[in-house]
């Protein structure tokens, strides 16, 4: 019985690499730090915070309610945070650099988390007072309910944009 025998042809073995090849990251998504989307998010946060702050400051007696004072303070902090990070994002875009340093990303994540929490708390407390004045006390004729509602809406929009920035930064930090 003749069985066929496999023929063995010598094949050169490729040299083994000392270091494994670098991991290939997926492309950076718009909205992450040092992208154009990130700059747009920061600019939107700034614009919404400025609008909410301007509306509240234009109301003469806003300081009589603690929740409205808290909204003004939270939007002022958000304004400073957003404009400073918009400048950093713009500078990184001009130099074509990435902001993927783990220490810097940790700072961005913690800062966005704190400012988004403050913005949400301020927006919710101000919305509660606005509903109280409008619906429960029915004193909109004596107060500026339309302005209060507009400022609260801008505060919620600010919170939404900051939350998006937080999630993009956190995602980038978690996948490093």
UniProtKB/Swiss-Prot annotation:
- Report the superkingdom from the record: Eukaryota
Instruction: List cellular component terms (GO).
Output: membrane; plasma membrane
Show which residues sit on the Extracellular side of the membrane. Answer: 67, 124-151
Q: Which residues lie on this side of the membrane: Cytoplasmic?
A: 1-45, 89-102, 173-176
Provide this UniProt record's keywords sorted from A to Z: Cell membrane, Membrane, Transmembrane, Transmembrane helix
Q: How does it sit in the membrane?
A: Multi-pass membrane protein
Q: Where in the cell is it found?
A: Cell membrane
Entry keyword annotation includes Membrane? yes
Q: Does the keyword Cell membrane apply?
A: yes
**Which InterPro entries does the record cross-reference, listed alphabetically?**
CASP_dom, CASPL-5
* Segments crossing the lipid bilayer: 46-66, 68-88, 103-123, 152-172
Entry-linked PANTHER family: CASP-LIKE PROTEIN 5A1, CASP-LIKE PROTEIN 5B3
Q: How does it assemble?
A: Homodimer and heterodimers.
UniProt similarity note: Belongs to the Casparian strip membrane proteins (CASP) family.
Name the record gives this protein? CASP-like protein 5A1
> What organism does the record attribute this protein to?
Selaginella moellendorffii (Spikemoss)
């Amino acid at each position: 019985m003749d069985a066929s025998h496999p023929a063995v042809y010598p094949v050169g073995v490729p040299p083994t690499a000392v270091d494994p090849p670098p991991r290939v990251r997926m492309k950076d998504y718009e909205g992450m730090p040092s992208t154009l989307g990130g700059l747009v998010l920061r600019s939107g946060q700034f614009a919404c915070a400025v609008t909410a702050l301007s509306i509240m400051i234009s109301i003469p007696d806003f300081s009589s309610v603690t929740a409205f004072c808290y909204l003004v303070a939270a939007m002022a902090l958000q304004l400073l945070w957003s404009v400073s990070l918009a400048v950093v994002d713009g500078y990184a875009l001009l130099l074509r650099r990435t902001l993927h340093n783990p220490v810097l990303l940790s700072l961005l994540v913690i800062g966005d988390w704190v400012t988004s929490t403050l913005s949400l708390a301020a927006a919710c407390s101000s919305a509660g007072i606005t509903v109280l004045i409008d619906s429960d006390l029915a004193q909109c004729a004596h107060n500026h309910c339309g302005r209060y509602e507009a400022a609260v809406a801008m505060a919620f929009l600010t919170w939404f944009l900051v939350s998006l920035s937080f999630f993009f930064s956190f995602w980038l930090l978690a996948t490093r």
